[in-house]
Design a protein with these regions (language model features):
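Feature for soluble, non-membrane regions of globular proteins
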Residues: 1-159
């Protein structure tokens, strides 16, 4: 549309308005799928595990907090972010794809809690079972790599 000289059109303005939703949806799905792998253990993420244990008291308590965010009465994403300023890991619920992302925070663990993620296999009331399956299939090596990159101020690639 830019090349066609339609930058001032309503259609172009609408595409710009929706760009954050569409693009962030793609990016968050890339993060989500990149971190899934059966047979991994949180022990493969020693730095991440130590950080959440120090901050939350244990990795299990951190996980319960993330699941609590994921069970919010809405659809969206549960994301464990790293705050590079404070060094803290924060669990957040993000509605849609672009609403609620914290500027400057780095996503470490991303859980898709839109219905399409669990309805086919776990049905309408199966969100808790789906969340357990995601945790069981988390690729903790990817989480550790994200954590180490974020902690050192590097930007990690989505895929």
């Amino acid at each position: 549309m830019r090349a066609a000289g339609k930058v001032g059109s309503l259609a172009y303005a609408d595409r710009r308005r929706r760009f954050g939703f569409e693009y962030n949806g793609m990016v968050l799905h890339e993060y989500y799928f990149a971190q899934l792998k059966p047979g991994s253990s949180i022990d493969q993420a020693p730095g991440f595990k130590a950080a959440v244990t120090e901050q939350f008291g244990s990795a299990e308590v951190w996980h319960e907090d993330l699941v609590s965010a994921a069970k919010s009465r809405s659809v969206g994403w549960a994301i464990a972010y790293y705050d590079g300023t404070t060094g803290q890991i924060n669990n957040h619920f993000i509605q849609l794809h672009e609403d609620g992302n914290v500027g400057g925070f780095v996503p470490l663990v991303i859980v898709d809690v839109f219905e399409h993620a669990y309805m086919v296999d776990w049905k309408a009331l199966g969100r808790a079972d789906y969340l357990a399956a995601v945790h069981k299939n988390m690729n903790w090596g990817v989480v550790e790599a994200r954590f180490q990159a974020a902690r050192s101020g590097q930007i990690f690639k989505r895929f």
